């Protein structure tokens, strides 16, 4: 299922955190934005643990694009990984690139600037500062990057959004 447009009203939060309504998909998002997609199920992971202490986490679901999810997270913690622990810190420019919804409208966002495409031409090529790039191909062309709070490329992982939920 392709997601070629992302707009609508958003106002749902993770883990009982304060809601952070967002009016539409686009350049109005905050700098620290985490993009991901889930093809089948809603988000089931738990937040509010010590891993996310002090972070505001927000779930953003477009009303007309049910496969796209956006997480606004000032501390930039990966919401499906338990690898990184410690105090919240801003993401240290791990990724570079741009993001586009569908076949047009490419924009750059925070978390170092993830590179990701949604829609029928969806793909992901993410680098960790230098020429260490990876590409993921997963049938339906939906992908999600992981942004860790360290500068090391060794702390970066890529997971395709296939199957039934978040990892």
Swiss-Prot record:
Q: Which InterPro entries match?
A: KRTAP_PMG
Subunit details for this protein?
A: Interacts with hair keratins.
Function description: In the hair cortex, hair keratin intermediate filaments are embedded in an interfilamentous matrix, consisting of hair keratin-associated proteins (KRTAP), which are essential for the formation of a rigid and resistant hair shaft through their extensive disulfide bond cross-linking with abundant cysteine residues of hair keratins. The matrix proteins include the high-sulfur and high-glycine-tyrosine keratins.
Disulfide links within the chain: none
- Keywords in alphabetical order, please: Keratin, Repeat
Q: Which family does it belong to?
A: Belongs to the PMG family.
Q: Name one Pfam family in it.
A: PMG
Report what the protein is called.
Answer: Keratin-associated protein 14
The lineage's top-level taxon is Eukaryota
Task: Give the gene that encodes this protein.
Answer: Krtap14
The sequence repeat units are at 98-114, 115-131
One GO cellular component this record assigns the protein to is:
cytosol
Q: What does UniProt note about where in the body, tissue by tissue, this protein is expressed?
A: Expressed at high levels in skin where it is found predominantly in the keratogenous zone of hair follicle cortical cells and at lower levels in the epithelium of the developing mammary gland.
| Region feature 2 X 17 AA approximate tandem repeats, mapped onto this chain | 98-131
